[in-house]
C-alpha cells in the first residue's frame, strides 16, 4: 500500500480542481489578487484534466461584436427561446458581453483558431460557433494557470480535516 504524504501550506486562495473552471479561476485569482498566495490542487494533471482536455472543434459562444455580427441582446433572445423562457436574462447578458474578450485572450495565448485569411474574422460553423483546433485548448489555459499560481499540486487529493482546514 502506498504511503500518502501530507503537505501543510498556508494560502490566500485555494483552487480545488484543475479543469477549465479551476485553471480559469487560478488565472482570475492572480489577476484580481496580485499579492495573494494562490495554490491549485488537481487529482490528475492540469495539462490534460477535465472534459475540455479531450479536445474541442469549436467555441460555442462568440458574439463577433467588433464586426457587428451579434450583440449580447441577441444571445439572450436565443437562450430564452432555446430554454423555453427558463433563463436569468441578466446573467446571460453579462456572460455574453464578456465572451468575446475571453476568446481574443485565448487567441493571443496561441490557441489555433480558423480565420478568414482576407478579413481576419473567425470562421463560423453557425450563428454562435467559431472553429478552432482544440487539441491544444486545455494545455494553453493550463499554462496560464501555471504562470498565475504560486504552487500547483498535480496527482493530489484533499481531505477536510477541520471546518477551516484541508489536508
Predicted regions span which residues?
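Short acidic, glycine/serine/threonine-rich loops at helix termini
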Residues: 25-28, 49-54, 165
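Single conserved hydrophobic/aromatic residue that forms the stacking wall/gate
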Residues: 158-167
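Aromatic/hydrophobic pocket-lining residues that form π-stacking "cages" and hydrophobic walls in ligand
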Residues: 25, 141, 160
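Conserved N-terminal/central alpha/beta ligand/cofactor-binding core
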Residues: 3-5, 37, 43-157
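A generic local structural motif
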Residues: 1-3, 25
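The Walker A (P-loop) glycine that initiates the GxxxxGKT/S ATP-binding motif of P-loop NTPases
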Residues: 16-17, 43, 162
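N-terminal Rossmann-like FAD-binding beta1-loop-alpha1 element of flavoenzymes
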Residues: 13-39
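Core beta-strand elements of the Rossmann-like FAD/NAD(P) dinucleotide-binding domain
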Residues: 9-11
Amino acid at each position: 500500500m502506498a504511503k500518502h504524504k501530507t503537505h501543510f501550506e498556508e494560502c490566500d486562495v485555494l483552487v480545488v480542481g484543475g479543469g477549465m473552471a479551476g485553471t480559469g479561476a487560478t488565472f482570475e485569482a492572480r489577476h484580481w489578487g496580485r499579492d495573494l498566495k494562490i495554490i491549485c490542487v488537481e487529482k490528475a494533471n492540469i495539462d490534460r484534466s477535465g472534459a475540455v482536455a479531450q479536445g474541442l472543434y469549436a467555441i460555442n459562444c462568440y458574439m463577433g461584436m467588433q464586426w457587428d455580427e451579434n450583440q449580447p441582446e441577441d444571445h439572450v433572445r436565443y437562450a430564452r427561446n432555446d430554454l423555453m423562457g427558463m433563463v436569468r436574462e441578466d446573467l446571460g447578458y453579462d456572460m455574453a458581453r464578456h465572451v468575446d474578450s475571453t476568446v481574443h485572450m485565448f487567441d493571443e495565448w496561441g490557441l489555433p483558431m480558423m480565420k478568414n485569411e482576407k478579413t481576419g474574422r473567425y470562421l463560423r460553423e453557425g450563428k454562435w460557433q467559431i472553429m478552432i483546433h482544440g487539441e491544444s485548448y486545455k494545455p494553453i489555459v493550463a499554462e496560464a494557470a501555471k504562470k498565475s499560481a504560486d504552487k500547483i499540486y498535480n496527482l493530489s487529493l484533499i481531505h477536510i480535516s477541520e471546518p477551516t482546514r484541508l489536508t
